[in-house]
């Protein structure tokens, strides 16, 4: 055996049987946990990059740019659009190339939009089209979620998948609040003056260096890339062709569960992208950047809790109750907005925190539903055609990972639709109410869908 093969095999797990209790306790658990925590670190940074424009767009006009409100909302929405599209091919990558190698590549390329954005904001003559392109490149970070969640699903047994996926997705989602907490702080610090970065004077006498919000992530991404290269593993049994993963698209439940995930995760990422801009338009006297991080923080932690709670009480039950509360909070939001009166920022903020909480919790519970339902369907279908238990388990793992990737792609569309809907509604009517009415109707439809398809009986094996 060559030295190169020996080095490669250090990271390749050719024998991986997480459903075997003895194997799991003696060997599998430690390996799975190590891969999980490195994955969480990489995904957290990816979410920081993905939602970078939610903090940058609010400040662009303060440093010499002159973009309209609708243009700024568009910049916050575009990363979610490209991220959603890219999640489809990204969902194939782990079975094709291996989780370790793909995590390394997908993390290191995020340095490109961060570095470019840092240069772009230093020149007020930078065209809007350049910012649109950088925003679309930030979408590569959002696509990481599909491959990351699919990869982690290979490492854990069925009984622990809800918790593992909740931790990976929830703490990964925490990157949104980490970015929205750190960015408003670092843009007023002389971090990169040694590289010639100069802040733009503000009315209060401070210097705003928006470059810092982008460049601060570059060294962290480099460290995460090295951690993935030296600390993660590829699973030999996870290898699968694109053709072998496509049949999941024919299953009705993939599309039904996609709608539920669009309503939960799509809301979380959409509100994360657009909340600061929305609050600024409705309550311009409030410095929202000091408070914006708390909503994504609540939602990210709630996602982790959603997976754990669903493992205990059932994903369907948790998801159903959660959608009822999402509809309730959306209805209450109408009462907080400026209309004939000034509105109430305190009430607006508290109700929106409730929306972040339920969107995050529902993201975890719907992902648990997806993992459980697709595993059940695949096991049933393989055994129905006379396949062995080993074959059934192997196909169940591959199909579940493919389904998680496809559904996460559709869910990410909410990150584009929600801020764009707010921007369009404000441009047409001067109010976000029109967009909120659509959200309310969608949540109510999801209550009915969850109850009628999954709440009254087990899903049909199709």
Curated annotation (Swiss-Prot):
Superkingdom of origin organism: Bacteria
Any one GO MF annotation of this record: nitrate transmembrane transporter activity
Cystine crosslinks: none
Topological domains, Periplasmic: 57-71, 123-124, 202-206, 280-287, 339-341, 423-432
GO biological process: nitrate assimilation
UniProt feature coiled coil, ranges: none
Topological relation to the membrane, as annotated: Multi-pass membrane protein
Cytoplasmic side: 1-35, 93-101, 146-180, 228-258, 309-317, 363-401, 454-462
Subcellular localization: Cell inner membrane
Cellular component aspect of the GO annotation: plasma membrane
Transmembrane stretches, start-end: 36-56, 72-92, 102-122, 125-145, 181-201, 207-227, 259-279, 288-308, 318-338, 342-362, 402-422, 433-453
Keywords recorded for this protein, A-Z: Cell inner membrane, Cell membrane, Membrane, Nitrate assimilation, Transmembrane, Transmembrane helix, Transport
Keyword field contains Transmembrane: yes
NCBIfam families found in the cross-reference section: 2A0108, PRK15034.1
Biological role: Catalyzes nitrate uptake, nitrite uptake and nitrite export across the cytoplasmic membrane.
Similarity comment: Belongs to the major facilitator superfamily. Nitrate/nitrite porter (TC 2.A.1.8) family.
Protein name: Nitrate/nitrite transporter NarU
Organism of origin: Salmonella typhimurium (strain LT2 / SGSC1412 / ATCC 700720)
């Amino acid at each position: 055996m060559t030295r190169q093969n020996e080095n490669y095999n250090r990271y390749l797990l050719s024998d991986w049987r997480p459903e075997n209790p003895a194997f799991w306790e003696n060997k599998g658990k430690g390996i799975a946990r190590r891969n999980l925590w490195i994955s969480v670190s990489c995904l957290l940074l990816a979410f920081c990059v993905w939602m970078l424009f939610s903090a940058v767009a609010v400040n662009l006009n303060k440093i010499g740019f002159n973009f309209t409100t609708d243009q700024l909302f568009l910049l916050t929405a575009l990363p979610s659009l490209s991220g959603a599209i890219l999640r489809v091919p990204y969902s194939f990558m782990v079975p094709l190339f291996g989780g370790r190698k793909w995590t390394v590549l997908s993390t290191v390329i995020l340095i490109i939009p961060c570095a470019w954005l840092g240069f772009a904001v230093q020149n007020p003559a930078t065209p809007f089209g350049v910012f649109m392109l950088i925003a679309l490149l930030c979408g590569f970070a959002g696509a990481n979620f599909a491959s990351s969640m699919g990869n982690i699903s290979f490492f854990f047994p069925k009984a622990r998948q809800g918790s593992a996926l909740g931790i990976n997705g929830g703490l990964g989602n925490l990157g949104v609040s980490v970015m929205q907490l750190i960015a408003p702080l670092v843009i007023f610090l002389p971090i990169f003056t040694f590289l010639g970065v100069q802040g733009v004077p503000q009315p209060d006498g401070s210097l705003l260096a928006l470059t810092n919000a982008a460049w601060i992530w570059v060294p962290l991404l480099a460290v995460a890339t090295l951690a993935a290269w030296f600390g993660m593993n590829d699973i030999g049994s996870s290898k699968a062709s694109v053709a072998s993963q496509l049949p999941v698209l024919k299953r009705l439940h993939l599309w039904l569960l996609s709608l539920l995930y669009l309503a939960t995760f799509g809301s979380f990422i959409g509100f994360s992208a657009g909340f600061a801009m929305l609050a600024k338009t409705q309550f311009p006297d409030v410095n929202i950047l000091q408070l914006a991080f708390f909503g994504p923080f609540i939602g990210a932690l709630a996602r982790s809790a959603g997976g754990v709670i669903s493992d205990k009480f059932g994903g369907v039950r948790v998801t159903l109750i959660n959608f009822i509360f999402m509809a309730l909070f959306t209805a209450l939001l109408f009462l907080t907005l400026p209309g004939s009166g000034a509105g109430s920022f305190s009430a607006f903020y508290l109700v929106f925190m409730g929306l972040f909480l339920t969107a995050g919790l529902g993201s975890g519970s719907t992902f648990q539903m997806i993992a459980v339902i697709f595993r059940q369907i695949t096991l049933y279908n393989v055994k129905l055609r006379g396949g062995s238990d080993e074959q059934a388990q192997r196909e169940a793992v591959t199909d579940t990972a493919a389904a998680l990737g496809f559904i996460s792609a559709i869910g990410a569309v909410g990150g584009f639709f929600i801020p764009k809907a707010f921007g369009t509604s404000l441009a047409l009517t001067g109010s976000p109410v029109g967009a909120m009415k659509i959200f309310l109707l969608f949540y109510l439809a999801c209550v009915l869908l969850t109850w009628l398809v999954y709440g009254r009986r087990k899903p049909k094996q199709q």
